[in-house]
């Protein structure tokens, strides 16, 4: 299935509220005579159908959300959840937690965890020197972020610096390409030598910049020669696209660097990782100034890269510290906590909040649940507590479940289907009783 992302707002975004729905460059309801629709428009405070804007259609928005989530929660004919599209739900201070649409979202989240949640609540504040919670002037705003996949998020404020504002350019952005840096190898090669580690990191960053600049030039040339005809139908060029640099294996970097005395869950490890992410942000900012092109820092998913890095390193450095065992070796993604870290989501949040907030190109924190959350209400309260008390930008709730081809969805992790086992046991007992 194609990798697709759908961003969902429960209230109409500010940049669309006053725009009219159109068809053939005219108002959708132009010359339409329908007394029932006109009466509904008047109930919504409009004197005519042609006076209606997108801001007047929130009831319809919510009906679409409910229908969409009903399909996602049901899954396919086997009860298997759909991998795509990935819905991103924008949680703002105007978000109404007590609507049928919100209930549909959190019923799905409690059962299969389809949604990613963009935090526009806790991320909007900082604590000042007096310990008071005050608005953060540098915070992302709902109109200034676009989620392009399961974690790539683009800061559209950078586009404002190019002139012309966001309107018309928000849907014309993306990433020209991604280069991921293997931090675990750096930790191994430069054990207990931070200066040498950063010197080599600088070399790798320059190589990443050179690679991304060459790719931008190549892709632009191909585009201008007419070799991307479908893209050219909706995209005027790649001027608003970011060059993305990502990182992988921060936890293993710290373990190798410290001789396995520290990891990213310790105070030393957390500070070491945070210092590096801040350093990377500054380097990327300087690349943007040098090249005139947009750059960002992403906690890249690295679904395949994490294994490839680990396997290539194992060939070269037999004693390098890695996650996993035997043939199933890998590096912990970006600056995430190790996979075997405890099951307390709030402990994970406390450790990751500052790190997760440092990326400019997107990141996501998975809060793993051992099984289905008891109810939509309980799931709602969990998400609400997280986004109100933490500033990290992007989270997802991930309940563990199993799928049987015969019985569909089963809460929790099961190697064998308990319902199938019950049926087999019943058959066995029936045969035994007949034999007796």
Predicted features along the sequence, with ranges:
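Conserved catalytic cores of very large enzyme subunits
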Residues: 1-239, 260, 266-436
